[in-house]
């Protein structure tokens, strides 16, 4: 009788000994397991955004008759303006703020950023939505204390939030002229009086330090950080945008009606303008975000939700990883798309859901 030999089991590859974890990897894995991360994409403008669809130029010119000379017809015969014309863009903003926010006295110094209002409004509405998710029932928006880092000469975020939600805002900036301009806007419009406080950040190396006092508490912070790493890079970006606008105008064959201003290379470009502090900082956006994240840890219990816009998508992941290492408990990435344009903000809190609920109960 032939003995049957049992087939030998295939040799298993030798298991490698696990690599000893460094302090960095231990910290990161521990913080990741405790961090509540959510990313959402929102298509179209928020339902509360007052700027759905095309601009109502009949309403806008009624609110600001001086806008009328800048209104043109596009190839479809629809009313528009030349978005390459800095004066036209500024007039459009003045009309929008007057017609929809009861801010009739708004102006900015020459050479300062003139922001697109619909997109700026969406940032505020999405943040309001974030706060509303913290409670059951109606959220007490009138009790919200907000902080805008880099309020600028235009004060656009406080204006929208105050007029739509009655938030109380503190606006900070490193530029004295921006603070003066924002203060004039606050003082000359009844709807803003008593709702907006301006603070000069006289330590340009800091973001929150020197602005958030020991007894200050904020439900949310907002920021549109400088994007470029140098003045030369900022100027190049501005010229590229202007070239693209000029090419689009030629392609579409847009014609201006009589009396409207024409584009001139010698005119100040306010819509793509901006001072140094508005456009660039050493190291660019990524460096600014890193400083903001590091400094936010110091005020972990004084701010419910920190937030900032992030222009460059590639900067989101490094910011998230850094926040996780700092021990942040909750991170939200909200992408906002309007047509082909996509913007995003990152919000973070050093408190978990239960702690945030207790924070709100304590401070309203």
From Swiss-Prot:
Q: Where is this region: Disordered?
A: 1-30
Q: A GO CC term?
A: cytoplasm
Could you tell me the EC number(s) of this protein?
Answer: 2.1.1.181
Role: Specifically methylates the adenine in position 1618 of 23S rRNA.
Reaction equation(s) it catalyzes: adenosine(1618) in 23S rRNA + S-adenosyl-L-methionine = N(6)-methyladenosine(1618) in 23S rRNA + S-adenosyl-L-homocysteine + H(+)
Give the EC class as a word.
transferase
Question: Biological process GO annotation list?
Answer: rRNA base methylation
Domain of life, per lineage: Bacteria
Provide the protein's localization.
Answer: Cytoplasm
Q: Which controlled-vocabulary keywords does the entry list?
A: Cytoplasm, Methyltransferase, rRNA processing, S-adenosyl-L-methionine, Transferase
Q: What is this protein called?
A: Ribosomal RNA large subunit methyltransferase F
Recorded family membership: Belongs to the methyltransferase superfamily. METTL16/RlmF family.
Cite the PANTHER family for this sequence. Answer: RNA N6-ADENOSINE-METHYLTRANSFERASE METTL16, SAM-DEPENDENT METHYLTRANSFERASE
Lineage in the entry? Answer: Bacteria, Pseudomonadati, Pseudomonadota, Gammaproteobacteria, Vibrionales
Gene3D superfamilies in alphabetical order: Vaccinia Virus protein VP39
GO molecular function terms listed in the Swiss-Prot or TrEMBL record: 23S rRNA (adenine(1618)-N(6))-methyltransferase activity
